[in-house]
């Protein structure tokens, strides 16, 4: 009789542990999906901010302003240089005339 009670408790405990792991798995998947959506939104916002060169054509203003898209430094305004990796105009660390 003692063995039957132990066996029944053991099965009950196994089911509880299995349910706990299943619940943790569901929470982990939900958290990962939520974080993935946040990262996608953040990437979209950054790309929209840094490609906001649509406001004026470079022909109208003569040069590209800070964080404007560029291919070479000569396209950027004074005190700005075309960043090699990101291809936008960044400050070239010079001050004055």
UniProtKB/Swiss-Prot annotation:
It comes from Cyriopagopus hainanus (Chinese bird spider). It is found in: Secreted. Disulfide bonds join 63-77, 70-82, 76-89. This is U6-theraphotoxin-Hhn1a 1. Residues 1-33 form the signal peptide. One of its GO terms (molecular function) is ion channel inhibitor activity. Residues 34-61 form a propeptide. Expressed by the venom gland. Keywords: Disulfide bond, Ion channel impairing toxin, Knottin, Secreted, Signal, Toxin. The presence of a 'disulfide through disulfide knot' structurally defines this protein as a knottin. Ion channel inhibitor. InterPro entries: Huwentoxin-1, Huwentoxin_CS1. It comes from the Eukaryota. Belongs to the neurotoxin 10 (Hwtx-1) family. 12 (Hntx-12) subfamily. Its main location: secreted. GO terms for cellular component: extracellular region.
């Amino acid at each position: 009789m003692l063995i039957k009670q132990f066996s029944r408790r053991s099965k009950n405990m196994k089911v509880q542990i299995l349910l706990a792991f299943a619940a943790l798995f569901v929470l982990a998947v939900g958290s990962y999906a939520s974080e993935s959506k946040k990262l996608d939104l953040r990437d979209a916002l950054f790309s929209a901010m840094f490609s906001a060169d649509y406001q004026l054509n470079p022909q109208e203003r003569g040069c590209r302003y800070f964080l404007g898209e560029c291919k070479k430094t000569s396209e950027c305004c004074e005190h700005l240089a075309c960043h090699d990796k990101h291809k936008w105009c960044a400050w070239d660390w010079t001050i004055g005339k």
